[in-house]
């Protein structure tokens, strides 16, 4: 629809946002494999290993850029910053793509790697990366089975994310690949955490390189905005 709207001569710009959450959603092997197969189809890349998946994601990243995209958006429970090796991530991909369930440690390592890769992609194109974090989802099993995901049974989560957030941002910054960033918390107890975190990674290259996002979801109301 973005392409059709642009080609129609519509004067208002309607630009897409890159939202690759499913590429790191490895909790359910069948769902992940289904996503990878769809990614292969739309990208035209045959995917049989981790490097293939990244190549396909880069191709889609390029496509979104061609459509005017300048923002990525990542919906995460918390920040992930586990230590990992390339060999570990490739092995984890092979395991989950083959249908085997991952351990909690493997899930966290994979998510940590993907966040860094996405951040590097955005830096290469000068995009801004956004993170909406802090929700716990699908809390009512009965209603989840009846209606599915995203049907009103999500709430504010309570996570200890300051260290992981700092480590993630520092990884990109240390490698000279920390792009413009906006952080949106869902739990108001993290307001001061983010407000102070911003100052750690401002580098003077542009005003407000790392920013506190506006009140989101449950905080998108008068009290939430004033506290922020």
PLM feature segments, named:
Residues 180-184, 212-213:
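Short catalytic-loop micro-motif centered on adjacent basic/acidic residues
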Residues 22-25, 217-221:
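Short, conserved secondary-structure transition motifs
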Residues 15:
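His/Asp/Glu-rich acidic catalytic environments and adjacent acidic regulatory segments
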Residues 25-28, 35:
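A conserved mid-domain beta-alpha-beta active-site/ligand-binding segment of alpha/beta enzyme cores
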Residues 18-20:
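Short amphipathic
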Residues 1-12, 34-180, 189-207, 224-227:
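Histidine/acidic residue-rich metal-binding segments in metalloenzymes
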Residues 208-217, 228:
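Generic long, charged, amphipathic alpha-helical segments
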Residues 187-189, 218:
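Short beta->alpha connector loops
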């Amino acid at each position: 629809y973005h392409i059709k709207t642009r080609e129609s001569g519509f004067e208002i710009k309607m630009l897409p946002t890159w939202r690759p959450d499913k590429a790191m959603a490895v909790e359910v092997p069948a769902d992940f494999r289904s996503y990878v197969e769809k990614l292969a189809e739309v990208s035209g890349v045959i995917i049989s290993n981790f490097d293939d998946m990244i190549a396909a994601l880069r191709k889609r990243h390029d496509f979104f850029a061609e459509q005017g995209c300048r923002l990525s958006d990542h919906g995460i429970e918390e920040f992930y910053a586990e230590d990992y090796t390339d060999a570990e991530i490739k092995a984890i991909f092979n395991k989950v793509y083959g249908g085997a369930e991952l351990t909690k440690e493997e899930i966290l390592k994979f998510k940590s790697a993907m966040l860094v890769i996405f951040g590097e992609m955005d830096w290469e194109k000068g995009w801004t990366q956004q993170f909406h974090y802090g929700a716990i989802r699908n809390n009512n099993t009965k209603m989840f089975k009846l209606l599915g995901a995203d049907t009103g049974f999500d709430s504010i989560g309570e996570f200890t994310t300051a260290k992981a957030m700092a480590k993630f941002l520092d990884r990109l910054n240390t490698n000279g690949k920390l792009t413009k960033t906006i952080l949106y918390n869902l739990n108001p107890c993290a307001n001061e955490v983010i407000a102070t975190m911003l100052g750690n990674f401002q580098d003077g290259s542009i005003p407000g390189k790392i920013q506190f996002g506006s009140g989101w979801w449950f905080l998108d109301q008068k009290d939430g905005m004033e506290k922020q």
